[in-house]
């Protein structure tokens, strides 16, 4: 069963994403901070990571993505954030600022979330 790691400091978001993804048959782990997220990636070995951008610091999600890529982690990363594309940053595996595979704005419809997850996990 593919495992998804959610890193978001909003417990309501975490709970709703867990509910949606668990119902689709995914194993789901969660972390609520940048530090917890980094530890969870090492411990849980997820097949997909969903990150919020703004947690304790305004750029926490981007820092997690940057740190993971610098460590050689190839796991697909989806940024799920209320700031959308307003930052003007280019995202993608080759981006230094936002080395993620997908950037999705909150709120997201459950069916759209599942479609994004399936895109990367081919389930």
Protein language model annotation of sequence segments:
Residues 80-82:
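Hydrophobic/aromatic residues positioned on beta-strands within the core alpha/beta folds
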Residues 62-63, 70, 84-104, 111, ...:
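Alpha4 helix (beta4-alpha4-beta5 surface) of REC/receiver domains from two-component response regulators
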Residues 11-29:
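Two-component/phosphorelay signaling modules centered on CheY-like receiver
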Residues 44-50:
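Active-site beta3 strand of CheY-like receiver
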Residues 10, 54-56:
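The short loop immediately C-terminal to the conserved phospho-acceptor aspartate in CheY-like receiver
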Residues 7-8, 31, 49:
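Conserved sequence signature across two-component system core domains
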Residues 30-39, 60-61:
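Helix N-cap/capping motif at the beta->alpha junctions
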Residues 42-44, 68-74:
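Conserved phosphotransfer cores of two-component systems
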């Amino acid at each position: 069963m593919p495992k998804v790691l959610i890193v978001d400091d909003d417990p309501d978001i975490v709970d709703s994403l867990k509910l949606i993804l668990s119902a689709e048959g995914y194993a789901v782990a969660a972390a609520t901070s940048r530090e917890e997220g980094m530890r969870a990636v090492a411990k849980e070995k997820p097949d997909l990571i969903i990150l919020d951008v703004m947690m304790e610091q305004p750029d926490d999600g981007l820092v997690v993505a940057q740190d993971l890529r610098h460590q050689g982690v190839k796991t697909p990363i989806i940024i799920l954030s209320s700031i959308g594309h307003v930052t003007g940053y280019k995202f993608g595996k080759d981006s230094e600022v936002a080395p993620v595979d997908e950037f999705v704005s909150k709120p997201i419809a459950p069916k759209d979330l599942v479609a994004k997850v399936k895109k990367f996990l081919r389930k």
